[in-house]
From Swiss-Prot:
One matching Pfam family: Ferrochelatase
Gene transcribed to yield this protein: hemH
Organism: Burkholderia pseudomallei (strain 668)
Catalytic reaction(s) noted: heme b + 2 H(+) = protoporphyrin IX + Fe(2+)
InterPro entries: Ferrochelatase (IPR001015), Ferrochelatase_AS (IPR019772), Ferrochelatase_C (IPR033644), Ferrochelatase_N (IPR033659)
Keyword Iron included in the entry's annotation: yes
Iron keyword on record: yes
Keyword annotations: Cytoplasm, Heme biosynthesis, Iron, Lyase, Metal-binding, Porphyrin biosynthesis
GO-annotated molecular function: ferrochelatase activity; metal ion binding
Pathway involvement of the protein, from the record: Porphyrin-containing compound metabolism; protoheme biosynthesis; protoheme from protoporphyrin-IX: step 1/1
One GO term of the biological process aspect: heme biosynthetic process
Listed name of the protein: Ferrochelatase
Length: 367
């Protein structure tokens, strides 16, 4: 049988339809910031749709999918959808979901930084779950002429359930492309000096505006990272070690000791053992032990979201106060702070080396 007799669509059905390639097309470079995701609206239906996608990821829930899907569809989604929607509604901003709003601000803030330093790059963002999806944004970048893409996860510490699954989604999208762009990935930046500096600046600026804890009197700074099941540590995931590394570097930058600063893990899901100590019980214990003031900062979250605004700002605060604590402070995440935007630019620039991203700058721009 000749290939001439086979319908064209049958030969290319594995791959997305693409326009003809032209040698004269723009050869552009893109930086794609990737975050976890968020529901499109604070409604039970939207939240259930988001949770179904998120909790169906085998890198997030590592149990047999046939068993898990029955539990997820019959128990978890019906129960958690409405309860989670109420929590999202409590933190929803006029512009939309906090995570999406702050991520968009990061993109818009880093664009002029690149331009001012002579970089001609496209900057955009995508979400691993929900919209805009990684596949859709990669397709948009291709249509804009991007032939090289830097994937920059907004997860400073590597984990299979965050960084790796974002890369999975990107590579799956690439697998459907006939004409693939060149791709680089940033695995982690848990110990990057610019990231640590941005964290320290965020804490210092908060204390400058709201007062520094009286560490000599027993006040505490708690560094709360997102938790993961403990078995992932036993299976070789480096997340726990990188969280501890970030915490140690941040404490050093702030001049604090392990007596003044605690490291905890939040957002436990299910009954399995997760990384410990858990954040809410630790804050309750601190309050019961007579700690007057506790400041909580989340170094692993680069943008404020449900887990920081609601879980830390309401649930963990209540645990501390009910335990006997008097003064609770939630230090905002990096969001679009100048130090963090500068760090993003620096991390991206290091990973763009060798790609044609620089343009000639006018003498007055250089001086």
């Amino acid at each position: 049988m000749s290939f001439d007799s086979v319908p064209r669509h049958a030969l290319s059905m594995r791959f997305d339809l693409e326009p003809p390639s032209h040698a004269s097309a723009a050869h552009r470079v893109a930086v794609l910031l990737v975050n976890l995701g968020t529901p499109d609206a604070p409604t039970p239906r939207a939240v259930r749709r988001y949770l179904a996608q998120f909790l169906s990821d085998p890198r997030v829930v590592e149990i047999p999918q046939l068993v898990w899907q029955v539990i997820l569809r019959t128990l978890i989604l019906p129960l958690r959808g409405r309860a989670s929607a109420k929590k999202y509604a409590a933190v929803w901003l006029p512009e939309g979901s906090p995570l999406r709003v702050y991520t968009e601000r990061q993109v818009e803030s880093v664009k002029p930084l690149f331009a001012a330093n002579g970089y001609r790059v496209i900057v955009d963002y995508a979400m691993r779950y929900g919209t805009p999806s990684i596949a859709d944004v990669l397709a948009q970048l291709k249509r804009a002429g991007a032939e090289r893409v830097l994937l920059l996860p907004m997860y400073p510490q590597y984990s299979s359930s965050t960084t790796a699954t974002a890369f999975d989604a990107a590579f799956a999208a690439l697998g459907r492309m006939r004409n693939q762009p060149e791709v680089r990935t940033v695995r982690h930046y848990a110990d990057h000096p610019a990231y640590i500096h941005a964290l320290a600046e965020q804490v210092r600026q908060y204390w400058a505006a709201h007062g520094r804890p009286a560490f000599d009197a027993g006040d505490k700074l708690v560094l709360s990272f997102h938790g993961v099941p403990k078995r992932t540590l036993d299976l070789g995931d480096p997340y726990h070690d990188q969280c501890q590394q970030t915490a140690a570097l941040l404490m050093s930058a702030l001049g604090l000791t392990t007596f003044e600063c605690r490291v905890t893990f939040q957002s436990r899901f299910g009954k399995a053992e997760w990384l410990q100590p858990y954040t809410a019980p630790t804050l309750k214990e601190l309050g019961a032990a007579g700690v007057r003031r506790a400041d909580v900062f989340c170094p692993g979250f680069t943008a404020d979201c449900l887990e920081t605004i609601e879980e830390i700002g309401i649930e963990v605060r209540d645990a501390f106060v009910h335990g006997g604590g008097k003064e609770f402070h939630r230090i905002p995440c990096l969001n679009a702070s100048p130090a963090w935007i500068a760090a993003l630019g620096e991390i991206a620039a290091e990973n763009l080396q060798g790609w044609p991203v620089r343009v000639a700058m006018a003498p007055e721009a250089v001086s």
